[in-house]
Amino acid sequence: MRQSLLHAVDPSFDARSRAGLSPKHQVFRELLEVILASPATSIYGFYCHAGQSYASTSLDEASQFLSAELKAVNDAAEIAMSVIARMNTVSSHNIPFVLSVGSTPTAHAATPETKANLLSSLRGKLEIHAGVGSVSFAVMNPG
């Protein structure tokens, strides 16, 4: 039985990385090749959390972070699909991949209009999570 992975992807490609590698990093493709070739693992999808989005001060800024998250997971899925296409075996990986993004600010920036514009270009199934959204009133407005 294969272990299914939700691969962390970093949207920022800088020293403030929260988790994962940026799809722009040269090692990213190499890591995917190892994971995808292994008989012990499969990729369920890609996960991204723009921790820096908590510093955003407007809906527009939060939307920019959301766009960066979506670009990162979409680029990761595109790279994985190209690696799988070059493999000489039948894929046992979850395609379309789950593309999981979000933090409280970026989840709130995901308006129906924004989602409609973005969904047409995604290489997987979108999942938007709200970080600590369920307790955001207590966390974001202490006192």
Regions found by a protein language model. Name each.
Residues Q3-G143:
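Active-site loop/helix belt of alpha/beta enzymes
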